[in-house]
Amino acid sequence: WLGDQDEDHFGDDLLDHFEQYEKAAKHKSELAKRGTSYVGLDKFYEDARNGNLPEVSYIVAPENLSEHPPFKPMDGSWIQKKVADAVMEGKAWDSTAIIYSYDETGGWADHVMAPHPPRSEKGEWIEDPFLKFKGVQPIGPGYRLPFYIVSPWTRGGNVFTEHAAHESQIMFLER
């Protein structure tokens, strides 16, 4: 596995916050080389075209291509197309799946409000000790997170409607 990113991932690569990666970075270990080094996206494009990608690669887009305000969906679609083109033109396309995933926990990508229980439901509302300024919040399923898969095995026009979360994608990769 390898994480491909530029230095400007604006805090979106959460591996930086795990102790084992902090220690690995200090010692320039194999873990740091794979998870938190900044080899740049040009290296990913080259490896994709030459069929030299590891079994799992993940990309953290730079801030200006993240679609976070003030940037636009057009900015994010540019890098998504560039990644897809590199992989689809590569020697390993016939055995590859690309998962595009968003990190939107604020619901900005969705037009449907997250379901939550009535305020009177006991045990379903808590005050987060770390975010007390937000007041009492519901617990349970959160906002829907958009993601899609591009692969020679997928068929267009289908929508996956089962409950899933970011860890669902990791579990899929581990199979």
Feature roles, as predicted:
Residues 1-175:
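N-terminal pro-sequences and low-complexity stem/linker regions of secreted or lumenal proteins
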